[in-house]
Each structure stands twice: as structure tokens, then as C-alpha cells.
Amino acid sequence: MKIKFKYVYIITLFSSLLLFGQTSKIKVRIINLQGLKGQISIGLFNNPESFPKKDEGRVGVYLEIKDSTVEHVFTDLENGTYAIAVYHDENSNGEFDRSFFGWPTEDYVFSNYAEGNFGPPSFEDASFELIDSVYIELEFR
């Protein structure tokens, strides 16, 4: 009887150690791109105060456009609340360009297709929960 409990204890301990170190991933796919010039910027945020402008709380990538679809997988993420901001950096200058009046001159989209009034959407509108793995497909509108 003691031996059986010993094995149950060891199996339970081993299982909990495996789950403790487990991380999640987010696969982001941008579809129906309307041009092959420039690059796609994808920002992944977990901090409401920095969304979508600051580098704090952001993991970002720039992807070369080779086709009408690009994708990236963010790995080794802790479970939690995240939001995504994407823009088409057509001139590859690393910035989200705006007109003299402040209107965007490059295509953009946010997770949940969230929209803001006279600016970006709130983190709450664009956010989603990451528990294991998430697949997000977005298209510029």
C-alpha cells in the first residue's frame, strides 16, 4: 500500500512540474495584403498603459512581405491578457506614418478588429486571454 502511494505521489509531482514550466504561443496571420513592398509590423502587448504606442510591455517583429499572407508565432509566453497591433510599413522606415493632420497613411488593424474614436482602441477592446495557444487571423480593412 505504501508503495502505491509513493508512485502516485511521484507521478503527481512530476505532472505538476511539467505544467508549472509550460508556456503558451500566439500565431498571428495577416491575410490579403494589397502590395508586396515594405514590411509588416506586429506588436504584441500585455500592458494596458503602453498599448499600442510604447515599447514597454511590447514584443514586436517586422516581417518581410513575400506574398499576400504573412505569419509569425510568438512563443514562450506567459498566460495572461494580450492585445495585438499591426501595421503595413510601406516605406520600411520603422514608423507608423501619418499625414499632416494626423490621419494614418499606412494600413493598420488591431486584434478583435477593435476600433477607436479619433485614435487607437482601448486595450480592453483589443485584448484577449491567452491560456494555452491562440490563432489570430487579421486583415487590413
PLM feature spans:
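Beta-strand signatures of extracellular beta-sandwich domains
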Residues: 41-45, 85
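Short strand-edge motifs at loop-to-beta-strand transitions and within beta-strands
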Residues: 68-72, 124-126, 134-136
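A short tyrosine-centered beta-strand micro-motif
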Residues: 80-86
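Acidic, glycine-anchored loop motifs typical of Ca2+
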Residues: 90-96
